[in-house]
Structures are given as C-alpha cells and as structure tokens.
Amino acid sequence: MALLSSSLSSQIPTGSHPLTHTQCIPHFSTTINAGISAGKPRSFYLRWGKGSNKIIACVGEGTTSLPYQSAEKTDSLSAPTLVKREFPPGFWKDHVIDSLTSSHKVSAAEEKRMETLISEIKNIFRSMGYGETNPSAYDTAWVARIPAVDGSEHPEFPETLEWILQNQLKDGSWGEGFYFLAYDRILATLACIITLTLWRTGETQIRKGIEFFKTQAGKIEDEADSHRPSGFEIVFPAMLKEAKVLGLDLPYELPFIKQIIEKREAKLERLPTNILYALPTTLLYSLEGLQEIVDWEKIIKLQSKDGSFLTSPASTAAVFMRTGNKKCLEFLNFVLKKFGNHVPCHYPLDLFERLWAVDTVERLGIDHHFKEEIKDALDYVYSHWDERGIGWARENPIPDIDDTAMGLRILRLHGYNVSSDVLKTFRDENGEFFCFLGQTQRGVTDMLNVNRCSHVAFPGETIMQEAKLCTERYLRNALEDVGAFDKWALKKNIRGEVEYALKYPWHRSMPRLEARSYIEHYGPNDVWLGKTMYMMPYISNLKYLELAKLDFNHVQSLHQKELRDLRRWWKSSGLSELKFTRERVTEIYFSAASFIFEPEFATCRDVYTKISIFTVILDDLYDAHGTLDNLELFSEGVKRWDLSLVDRMPQDMKICFTVLYNTVNEIAVEGRKRQGRDVLGYIRNVLEILLAAHTKEAEWSAARYVPSFDEYIENASVSISLGTLVLISVLFTGEILTDDVLSKIGRGSRFLQLMGLTGRLVNDTKTYEAERGQGEVASAVQCYMKEHPEISEEEALKHVYTVMENALDELNREFVNNRDVPDSCRRLVFETARIMQLFYMEGDGLTLSHEMEIKEHVKNCLFQPVA
C-alpha cells in the first residue's frame, strides 16, 4: 500500500470515512496527486488502528488492495475497516467453456422423435380413465374362486381361471416375471394353487407351484420387513390354514411362517371388533383374510359406492362369496370389462395415476409440452377433492397422506383453492404424521411427498411447519439407515430423491436442476407395493424418460449458443475492460437458463442476462468504486438519458454508461415490437429507481450511517436489483402487458416487494461478515443489532432468517393467488426469488462461484448432456 505522511493525520477528523480525491482530502490533494498522478485515482479509503485517528494507509487505484476473501473484519459497528474490493477472476474462461461444450447437435431424426414422443404422451394423458395397471395373479385367483351364480358347477368368471392356467412362470410361481420379490411371489403362488385345487384342475401347475413354494419360501426371511405387502400378515396365514385343510403339501413349520402367524394373532388381539364396523379402515382391503371373524351383515354397511371394498377385487370377491351382494358382483364385472381375463390388485387408481403422471412430467422438465393435458388431469382431481383428504381412487372411502400431500402441493401450485388443514387428518396426538387414519405406518415415499408439500406453505399454516420438521427428521434418519427401504414402492433411487429434496427444498430447487437430477433418479420400471406388487405404466415408462433426455439436451444446445453470443457481446461492448467489477457472464446466464429455459424465451433470457450483468456492474460501481460526485453525475445521465454527459465521466464510467445506454435503447426497440408501444420511458424509470437506492446506500456509507432495520430493508430491497431485472425482462415473456398487469407486479406490489426482500435477506446472511470487513456498515444483521444492542450477532442472524422464512411463505401465496398475472410473468418474479436462495445457500455464490457448488450446477445445466 502507498503510505501517507503521518504528519497529515492531524488534518483528518476522528472516525472512519471514505475519502474521495475531490471531496475528502482538499488540504493535501496536491501532495497525493504528486505521488500517484500516474494512477489517476478516483477513490480512496482510509484505514486506521482501533481507537486511533492515525492514518495507516490510503488505498487507491495503482496501489495494492486486499483480496476480496481476505478482507479484515472488525468487531465494531461504529469503526469498521474500509478497503477497496478486489474480486476473484471469473472461472468460466473461453477455453474452459470450449472444453466442456458438447459437439453434439440435435439431429432432424431426434427432433422428429421428440415430436412423436410428445404426441404419444399427450395420448397417454387423454386416455386416462380409471387407471392403467398390471394383472394381479393373487386377486385374479380370488375372483376365479367365485362359483357360477346360476348354481352350475363352474366358475362365474371362467376366463380368470384360464388366465391362471396360462400365466404360470417358468419357475412354477405366479406374479410379475421381471422383478422377484419373495413376499409377492409366495403370496400369489399360494392363492393360485388353492384356486386350482378348489376347481380340481391344473394338476401340473399345482405341482410346480408347490415345488416353487417349498424351495423359495425361505427367502422371505432375507427380505426387509418394509417389503412385506400390505395386509400380508392377515391374508397369508389365513390361506395357509385353508391350504392345510385342502391337504396341500407345504412347509407349514418354517420359522418365518410361524412368525407371520404370531404377528397375525397379535394384530387381531389388538383389534377392537367395534372398530372394524364403525368406520372404513384399511382392514377392508384384506377381508379375505378375516373371514372367520367378520360379521358380514355389518361389514356391508362399509361398502364403497362403486360396490367394492376399498377397491380390492380379492376382498370384494370374498364378501360376494359370503353374502351374494349384487353390488360386489357389479364391481367385479366392471373391472373385468376393463381388463378382460384378469384383475389388478386394486381398481380404480384414477386420482393416483393423474397426480403422479403430472408430478413425473414436471420433475422431468417436460411439462411445458403438456399444459392442456395437465390442466385436464388436475381439473379431474380437484372435482373429487375432499377436505378430509383423498385416496388413490375417487370412490375410495379412506384418504391417505401420500395422495393427499401430492394433491395439495400440485393443486395449490396450479392455482386451485385447497387448504393445508387437510393434513390434520393424518396427525396423531404426538404430532407425528402417518399414512392412514388410525395407523402408525409410514414409508419413505409418503413422508417425502409430505415434505415436498410442506414447502409450499402460506403464512400462518402451522400444520405445514410441523409437517416439515417431522418429515425432515424422519427422512434424515432414513438416510442414516443404510438398510432402510420404502414400504410403498420399489424405486430406482429413492435415496437420491430424498437427498435432493433435503438439500434443495422448493425455494432453491430450480427447474433445470431438478430435471437433471430426476432424469438420473427416475425409474421407468418402478413398481409399487399394495397387497401385491403392481406397476403404473402411465406413471413409470420409457417414453417420459426418453423425451426428458432428448428435450434436456436439445434445450442445452440452444443455451450454449446463446451463452457464446453473450460472451462475445461482453467483450465487443467494452465491458470486459472494466476492472472494478465482477465478470460473471456465465453464472448470470445460468441464473436465467435454470428456469426460463424453453426455446421460445430466448429473447427473455438475453435481456435478463444483460440487465443482470448491468445490475452487478452498477452495484460494484456505487458500492465501492465511484466517488459521490461521479455517482451523482452517472445518475443524472440516466435520468436525462443524455450521452453527452459521458465526457465529464472517468473512463470506466464512460464505458459503463455508454454500453448501458446503447443496450437499453436496443432492448427498448425490441420491447416496442413485443408490446406494441414505446417502453423506453418505462425502462429508464425502472433504472432511475435502482440508482436512487444505490445512491442512498453510498451516502450512508460516506456518512458511516447505520439506518434502522425497517429503513434499511425498504431501500435495500430495491438496491438488490431484482426488481429492476424482472420489470424489464417481463416485457419479453410473450405476453402483451397492460398497465394493470404491470401494476400487479410493479414497485408497489407486494409480490415484487417480497421477491426483493427475500433476495436481500438471503444475500445479507451470507455476505454481511465479508462486507463488514470491507467497511460496509449497513446490512440486515448490523441494522437489527443496532436497534437491539442487547442481543448477540447469532440472535440477530436468527431473526433475519425468521423474517426471510415468513416472507418466503408469503411469496408462495402471492405466486399462487396472483392469477390475474400471466403465468410466465408470475414465474419470472417467483423463480428470480428462488435463484437467489440457490446462489446464496452456501455463501456468496456469485462472487465466489468457483469455490461453491454453483460451479457444478452451471456445468450440469449448461454443458453436460444427459446420457
């Protein structure tokens, strides 16, 4: 550093002040000019020891500055250390980008394949009825048992008996051939053996089935309890008892069989018989295993409107054989009319299918192709929404937390009026959440869906906060248990899904990053566990995955071209000559491409990136580089929109102002084409408001003034620049925006205020220490501590986080309820708030992106294609 003569220290007042060439050192400007005239300094900062007014150093252009990350910290709010900031160089140099950029271009054949897949997936949505699923050998065996209603010695549904005879697997078992789950195979095989024995047919199949049972039953001991199908401990022992009566040669003395029988007896002992008939419970799903204790006249009162018992063909068949109830028979005929010669493990599955299909295409990032289809699916679900919750089917009398939480989250985000009070149905007296009313069963997938749901909370929804805490605890414990499995599904990578959800909850999960992650985790052959293993082809299939990969790579190739163009603009415009600011073109472009990624928003991404680049430059200019005189001149130039004023500006300001002037004029020309009216005055006004906020902060800094918390927030929510960025970019979202629409997202709107507030607060929580070390006196933490000198810094930081979390809940509500604002405009505001949460989740993810995970996000989003 260039040292000043200590004899001059007496001329400097006590305190800590930023000094400028013309304003703050008039008494010895000649001396300074003589020493550093070659450097043409424009900004100086004094540093002196604690409790002393002795000048130690003057830092200006041409002198050595402290690196950004090595800036001194001070314990005092009244006498911070001021140093000139020096930012780390940008990581994304051209050679780095070139080394990562894929040479693959989307071919005409791939584009044609995308069109075909889009058409086929649209047909999937349009053909959704009561649910598509695979055969259940177990349930089909129970339906095949039903004797002819005309009294003849034949099955009522002979086609189901024939299906059993024709669909035994090579190993002698029945069930899904591509996936072996011992519980499922043993249960289905036992059911088929008994049915064939009752009808005295299929001797060969019976023999092979018994052999399979004997050799494979012991494998159940090696499988996790969580893989035990629903109701297994009820129906399996009951069928074993029946098999023994029929004289079937089975290993009844196996240890696991004895254990299952003991579990059944213990469960039935705990079951008050009055509960069975008082209200619908999950026991209705397994009545075929409770035949010796059921009062059939009473149980009929709990029959669903569609004639089934909890949509289970097996349970309904058992009730029909005991009662002859016509509605049971009508239900079974209805199911067989759909599937022909077999039945699934439960049916219908209409709500489950629609919700999970929508969730799947959204998480894979291909939902922008299916907006109408998604709306139709959600309209259907909402028409069957119930304040007590929903189950997997519209006629299902028992709601479950899995379908309810999924429905609450998706419906809310799509603007449907649904209350979080619905989750109270699934909370016990200890505050824990469970899947079904009156039970304690929980699984990873249902708790994951509740957790995802809890993040779309509105202000004051304590049930959502409770759900978040409960499920986070459960899911973190599940991750620690390496042997943990989900109770309701066998998914490709449920662990990866949980890890992503916990690390990147809703407010920092950007669409492109979630798509990239879910493409890796998604299983096109995932199966679910009910009473038997079942598949949902409209939820898990290769078409979704194939389109997701093609679409991701196609969009990524477009983004790479746009980024190259922007980097060329950065250099050719002269902005690359500015040394006082951060070069973060790639990171800034990523912030846009991470959410407004669709091809039709290319201009919006371009404008968003350029305006964001300018907001960073202006922040650095007003924050530490420019003198108050020059900043005032710059602001006046923007206000008058007068290029002639650049002659009075320093060289770096000339570059900054000239490029801003030219770029904004170009944007305004394009904006006029898009909006059908002149928008230059509108854009200039947006910029003026930003510069006024920056100027106020520069004046605070010069005066060493620490404002009140509220005063700080009011100004800093503007100076964070997000409003400027959004209010200009929104002109290019493909919508003609009236003054009324603009007012709903304008400076006076709560929506925009919350975006600025949450962005400012998350920024401050991660940067206030470093900025305090550079001499900044105003941050949310410091201002709150000034008002509350009795609290610690940790307590102040906790308060700021609380304010931010509450504001994020309110932001959710504004995003969902602002239906008068076009979706693309609402997205722009909301996603800009979310990208701030992502960038500052670890620290200053813009300035220090090369040290943080942002670097990997940029790489995955913009450069690494999916295979």
Curated annotation (Swiss-Prot):
Stored InterPro entries: Isoprenoid_synthase_dom_sf, Terpene_cyclase-like_1_C, Terpene_cyclase_plant_C1, Terpene_synth_N, Terpene_synth_N_sf, Terpene_synthase-like, Terpene_synthase_metal-bd, Terpenoid_cyclase/PrenylTrfase
Positions of Mg(2+) 4 binding: 400, 402
Gene3D superfamilies: 1.50.10.160, Farnesyl Diphosphate Synthase (1.10.600.10), Terpene synthase, N-terminal domain (1.50.10.130)
Pathway as given in its UniProt record: Terpene metabolism; oleoresin biosynthesis
Keyword terms: Chloroplast, Isomerase, Lyase, Magnesium, Metal-binding, Multifunctional enzyme, Plastid, Transit peptide
Motif DXDD motif per record, residues: 400-403
Cell location: Plastid, Chloroplast
Chain positions recorded as Mg(2+) 2 binding sites: 619, 623
UniProt-annotated binding residues for Mg(2+) 1: 619, 623
Residues the entry annotates as binding Mg(2+) 3: 763, 767, 771
SUPFAM superfamilies for the chain: Terpenoid cyclases/Protein prenyltransferases, Terpenoid synthases
GO molecular function: copalyl diphosphate synthase activity; magnesium ion binding; terpene synthase activity
Transit peptide location on this chain: 1-68
Cofactor note: Binds 3 Mg(2+) ions per subunit.
Pfam families in alphabetical order: Terpene_synth, Terpene_synth_C
Main location: plastid
Residue span of motif DDXXD motif: 619-623
Binding site for substrate: 267, 487
Gene Ontology BP terms: diterpenoid biosynthetic process
The protein's required cofactors: Mg(2+)
Record's function text: Involved in defensive oleoresin formation in conifers in response to insect attack or other injury. Involved in diterpene (C20) olefins biosynthesis. Bifunctional enzyme that catalyzes two sequential cyclizations of geranylgeranyl diphosphate (GGPP) to isopimara-7,15-diene.
UniProt remark on domains: The Asp-Xaa-Asp-Asp (DXDD) motif is important for the catalytic activity in the class II active site relevant for the cyclization of GGPP. The Asp-Asp-Xaa-Xaa-Asp/Glu (DDXXD/E) motif is important for the catalytic activity in the class I active site, presumably through binding to Mg(2+).
Family membership noted in the UniProt record: Belongs to the terpene synthase family. Tpsd subfamily.
Protein name: Bifunctional isopimaradiene synthase, chloroplastic
Organism listed in the record: Picea abies (Norway spruce)
Species lineage: Eukaryota, Viridiplantae, Streptophyta, Embryophyta, Tracheophyta
Gene assigned in the entry: TPS-ISO
